[in-house]
C-alpha cells in the first residue's frame, strides 16, 4: 500500500510539472477530436428566418412544435 501511494504521488507531481512546462498532456492532444463539427458552422444554430407575413417581411423563431413567435416586424 505504501508503494502504491508513492507511485500515485509521483504521477501527480510529474503531471503538474509537465503541465507547468506547457507540454501537452493526453487530454490536450485529444481536444481536436472531441469537437463537434456543428460547432464550427454557426449557420447550423441559426433558428431565425424571414417569413412573408401578409406582404410584410417578419423574423420568426420556430419552436419544435412548429409554433412560431413573432420577434421583429418591419
Swiss-Prot record:
Domain of life according to the entry: Eukaryota
| Residues of the signal peptide | 1-22
What subcellular locations does the record give? Secreted
Q: What coarse category fits the chief subcellular location reported for this protein?
A: secreted
Kindly indicate whether the keyword Metal-binding belongs to this entry: no
Q: In which tissues is it expressed?
A: Expressed by the venom duct.
GO CC terms for this protein?
A: extracellular region
Q: Which UniProt keywords apply?
A: Disulfide bond, Secreted, Signal, Toxin
GO molecular function, one example?
toxin activity
Q: Which residues form the propeptide?
A: 23-49
* Disulfide bridge map: 53-63, 58-68, 62-73
Q: Which family does it belong to?
A: Belongs to the conotoxin H superfamily.
Role played: Probable toxin with unknown function. Does not produce any changes in intracellular calcium levels in mouse dorsal root ganglion cells. In vivo, does not produce behavioral changes when intracranially injected into mice.
Q: What is known of its domains?
A: The cysteine framework is VI/VII (C-C-CC-C-C).
Q: This protein is called what? A: Conotoxin Vc7.2
Q: Which organism is it from?
A: Conus victoriae (Queen Victoria cone)
Q: What is the lineage of its organism?
A: Eukaryota, Metazoa, Spiralia, Lophotrochozoa, Mollusca
Amino acid at each position: 500500500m505504501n508503494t502504491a501511494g508513492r507511485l500515485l504521488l509521483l504521477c501527480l507531481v510529474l503531471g503538474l510539472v509537465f503541465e507547468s512546462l506547457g507540454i501537452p498532456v493526453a487530454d490536450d492532444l485529444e481536444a481536436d477530436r472531441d469537437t463537434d463539427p456543428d460547432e464550427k458552422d454557426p449557420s447550423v444554430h441559426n433558428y431565425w428566418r424571414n417569413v412573408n407575413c401578409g406582404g410584410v417581411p417578419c423574423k420568426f423563431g420556430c419552436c419544435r412544435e412548429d409554433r412560431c413567435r413573432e420577434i421583429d416586424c418591419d
